[in-house]
Design a protein with these regions (language model features):
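Key residue(s) within conserved catalytic/signature motifs
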Residues: 2-338
């Protein structure tokens, strides 16, 4: 169980939270489980609990970084979506950005997009107060800022290494200061596609976020991160930081798949069909969702019973239909794996 206020795990029988002094004997209007969306999210309770605990740390002033690794389509995005709902309920500002696949994106692209969102959602006075002494650097990377702060000066000229350090430091200072006013959660998806500069900035922020109300959550495909990948080097370097945690997201269990089937109206699906589906799709969360869509494109309907798209209407026919659906899923869902 978790504290309804800060999200930290609470010991059995505890009367108050050790982190925020919340009275655990008094019912809360908003608990962690209340804000987990009822959109078919099953399983992953351990992972969501770890992320919720990290959120509690950040809210309490201990900055955290959590990276989620796993196969494409395994459910990383779904997990962080649930965390975003919890963070929003805890009055944190949540900013979300994906790294760009392919060539052509400028350096620091995901960070610049996040900073643009920060500029758009913050009033000029609050933003200026959080930027610190190197505010001019922001005008170079986020041109929209100059419309809010027309008197913003031009940064002095430095050699490339010094300029990069000042840029990193100014962004880190802003995020730390802004999070003191209101906790900030940054979601960085698809870090396996991140450019080296973006990862270097991430490493810099990690080294100076311990005393902040900042939580950074990143996702990546572990099968696309080789030993010589820039992200592998980052992972090796951040292991020494107390605020870092890595979560490996595995396959859904047979029980999880069965629960998804039930939530989709398939409580009457034969167990051996559920077991075969679990084996064939190897517990991949995206494949499960696509499989359920294709088995009955029209949903469970008013009968709330599963309708097999199969005219044979027998066990052998069900299994043949399942094989056909899995082939369709595997050919059509590959491009949408996350």
């Amino acid at each position: 169980m978790f504290c309804p206020k800060c999200g930290h795990e609470k010991p059995q029988g505890a009367r108050s939270c050790d982190f925020c002094d919340q009275d655990l004997n008094t019912p809360s209007d908003s608990t962690i489980t209340d804000v987990v969306r009822s959109s078919g999210f099953v399983g992953r309770q351990r992972e969501l609990g770890e992320l919720t605990s990290a959120l509690g740390d950040a809210i309490s002033g201990h900055g955290r970084l959590v990276l989620l690794g796993g196969d494409p389509g395994i459910g990383k995005t779904c997990i962080v979506q649930e965390l975003a709902a919890i963070a929003d309920a805890r009055s944190a500002d949540v900013f979300w950005e994906h790294c760009y696949e392919g060539e052509g994106a400028p350096p620091y692209w995901p960070w610049f997009q996040i900073l643009r969102s920060c500029v758009a959602e913050s009033d000029a006075e609050r933003f200026e107060a959080a930027m610190g002494s190197d505010a001019e650097a922001f005008g170079e990377i986020v041109p929209e800022l100059r419309s809010k702060l027309p008197n913003l000066g031009v940064p002095p000229t430095f050699d490339p290494d010094s300029a990069r350090f000042r840029l990193f430091d100014s962004i880190t200072t802003y995020l730390k200061n802004a999070s003191n006013d209101r906790p900030i959660v940054l979601m960085l998806e698809d870090l396996h596609w991140a450019d080296a500069s973006s990862l270097a900035l991430l490493e810099h922020i990690i080294g100076d976020m311990a005393e902040s109300n900042l939580l950074i959550v990143g996702t990546y495909r572990d099968n696309e991160v080789s030993l010589d990948h820039s992200l592998s080097r980052i992972l090796g370097n951040v292991l020494r930081h107390d605020g870092f945690q890595s979560l490996d997201i595995g396959s859904l269990t047979l029980g999880d798949v069965g629960e998804l089937v039930t939530l989709s109206g398939g409580s009457d699906m034969p167990r051996d069909i559920v077991e075969q589906a679990h084996r064939m799709i190897e517990g991949n969360a995206l494949f499960v969702g696509e499989l359920l869509k294709l088995l009955d494109a029209n949903g469970p309907g008013e009968t709330h019973a599963w309708q097999f798209a199969n005219p044979l209407g027998n066990q052998r026919g069900h299994k043949q239909t399942l094989r056909w659906v899995v082939r369709r899923v595997q050919s059509g869902a590959d491009g949408r794996r996350r």
